[in-house]
């Protein structure tokens, strides 16, 4: 077992609703925020950040909110994030925000510019009809284009990401061109993860042969060092090189009372212990691959997702009942 060091701690409060219902939502958004009241969360975060920066020098500590950036008092929220030293005080993921017309989009972007936002990111699931179905909201595609146009006018740079599957791969070339024309600084292709509702996309996970539908330009936007076929990963000597750990503290209505009575470091140590218990319950990747791997498998994965896929199969076969540290709606961890 490799030595794991906690290198970052993120505190989150999932108290802000998302206006989409995306098919692969990492946070399995179901219309009901799990976080605690905003002000209560900020007070606790301020104490935790102060304690953790003193106790864990050299460990990066940050604060964020979700499910979307559609905070009812977004300007004040951004000022709070800046005061707490959060990276999201300069970068926003602009998915799942409320419907706005062109004028309202301009007002939003002008406010973001004034508050020091330097970069935005948009996730686009396909061309208009497909995107709207995938996002679970009619008009979402057009909203993203309005927001991109307003960001461009306000002088805020933005990037775009396209999660590609068997369903939308043949739309990708056209979509890449549209996003670049809209002013996207970069366009990245990625394979959806297996976590949250991502596991429901397994039947349409991209395979190596599907890449022939992409132009050379679009194909170059998918990092094939990160995304490889199962066969390619299994041919690597030791593909899982996990030495770093991020601890996630999620302030929720079902834990905030307890967290308020405890020191930040005691909560972090509790989650670190849960992380160790979770990962020690499984054989290593090589053993899991012997049991569940397909040496000829052509589906594309990040190694993290393939590892997660094997662990899920092992847990089901052995009826494991573990605290799921990979569920990002609750306090947990992520290794890399």
Give a label for each model feature.
Residues 71-77:
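Active-site-adjacent beta->alpha loops and helix N-cap segments on the catalytic face
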Residues 223-324, 336:
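Accessory C-terminal segments flanking Radical SAM cores
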Residues 48-54, 78-85, 107-117, 149-153, ...:
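Acidic (Asp/Glu)-rich catalytic clusters
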Residues 1-28, 49, 53-64, 248-253:
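N-terminal pre-triad scaffold of radical SAM enzymes
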Residues 45, 101-111, 170-176:
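Short, acidic/polar
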Residues 28, 34-36, 125, 133, ...:
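Radical SAM enzyme [4Fe-4S]-AdoMet core and its adjacent flexible, acidic
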Residues 41-45, 74, 105, 144, ...:
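Aromatic/hydrophobic pocket-lining residues that form the small-molecule binding cavity
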Residues 9, 29-41, 53-71, 84-103, ...:
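Core AdoMet radical
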């Amino acid at each position: 077992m490799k030595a794991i060091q906690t290198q970052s701690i993120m505190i989150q409060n999932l108290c802000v609703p998302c206006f989409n219902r995306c098919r692969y939502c990492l946070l399995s958004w179901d219309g009901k925020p799990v976080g605690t009241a905003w002000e209560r969360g900020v007070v606790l975060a301020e104490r935790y950040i102060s304690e953790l920066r003193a106790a864990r020098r050299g460990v990066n500590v940050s604060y964020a909110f979700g499910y979307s950036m559609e905070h009812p008092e977004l300007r004040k929220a951004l000022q709070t994030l800046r005061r707490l030293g959060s990276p999201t005080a300069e970068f926003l993921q602009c998915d799942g925000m409320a419907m706005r017309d062109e004028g309202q989009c301009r007002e939003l972007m002008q406010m973001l510019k004034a508050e020091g936002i330097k970069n935005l990111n948009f996730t686009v699931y396909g061309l208009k009809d497909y995107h709207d179905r995938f996002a679970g909201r009619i008009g979402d595609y057009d909203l993203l284009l309005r927001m991109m146009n307003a960001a461009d006018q306000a002088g805020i740079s933005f990037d775009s990401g396209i999660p590609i599957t068997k369903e939308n791969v043949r739309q990708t070339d056209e979509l890449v061109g549209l996003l670049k024309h809209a002013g996207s600084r970069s366009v990245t292709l990625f394979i959806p993860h297996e976590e949250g509702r991502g596991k429901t996309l397994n039947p349409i996970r991209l395979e190596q042969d599907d890449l022939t539908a992409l132009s050379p330009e679009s194909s170059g936007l998918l990092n094939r060092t990160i995304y490889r076929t199962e066969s390619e990963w299994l041919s690597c000597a030791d593909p899982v090189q996990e030495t770093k750990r991020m601890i996630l503290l999620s302030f929720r209505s079902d834990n905030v009372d307890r967290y308020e009575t405890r020191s930040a470091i005691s909560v972090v140590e509790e989650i670190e212990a849960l992380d160790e218990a979770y990962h020690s319950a499984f054989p290593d990747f090589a053993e899991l691959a012997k049991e569940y791997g397909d040496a000829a498998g052509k589906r594309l994965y990040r190694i993290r997702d393939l590892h997660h896929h094997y662990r899920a199969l092992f847990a089901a076969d052995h009826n494991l009942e573990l605290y799921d540290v990979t569920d990002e709606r609750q306090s947990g961890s992520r290794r890399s």
